Amino acid sequence: MTTIAIIGLGNMGKGLAKRLAGKTDLVLASRDHAAATAFAATLPAGAVVLDQASAIAGADIVVLALPFEAALEAAGNPALKSKIVVDISNPVKADFSGLAIGHTTSAAEQLQAAAPDAKVVKAFNTIFAGLFDLPAAQTAAVPAFIAGNDEAAVAAVVELAVLAGFAVEKTGGIDAARLLEPLGMLNIRFGYGLGQGTGIAPNWIKLAA
């Protein structure tokens, strides 16, 4: 069974852990070990709580469920060599007025540069944390947009997304994150800035062959 390490237990990390619990070998790591242990105890199948270095070392897939700057710092860990690393971040400005980087780069590409021997895959950045609390049947048509350069790594993250109860849209290489992160920012604007709430998600509708 694949071992998935979730680094960071904010709303996104906890939401993904809830969806994956009992479906894979799940390892959690957080700065607050006691809080992580208490959260793991609430999961139906439980989860192993380790320090970040140990969690990464034993994982097949490492989900950096962290804000961009923290994810970039974590990407410098040499233990990520040869690992599949999932970047779920949107590099938003501190005041949420827009993205701090973009056009010619992306958060995912910055992480790949910081961890050149890892296989970075962008995913879940257009999904609000609250959707993880819905029954999986309600999110089965909600796509996780996925971008990455390594085909095997992308395939593994596709499986992870489906396991977590979402549909999948593959968008190409890691440079596609330059498009996905503005899409994530647009979703944030709709949800918070324009009052639509967080029970929303972008999707592509095929109207004709």
Task: For every predicted segment, state its role.
Residues 15, 19, 114, 160:
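Rossmann-fold NAD(P)-dependent oxidoreductase module
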Residues 65-66, 88, 123, 147:
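Short, well-ordered coil/turn residues at beta-beta hairpins
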Residues 89-136:
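Rossmann-fold NAD(P)-binding glycine/threonine-rich loop
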Residues 53-61, 68-95:
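Rossmann-fold NAD(P) dinucleotide-binding segment
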Residues 143-209:
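Active-site-lining helix/loop region of Rossmann-like oxidoreductase modules
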Residues 49, 119-124, 169-172:
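General beta-strand structural signal in soluble alpha/beta enzymes
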Residues 1-42:
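NAD(P)+-binding Rossmann beta1-loop-alpha1 motif at the extreme N-terminus of oxidoreductases
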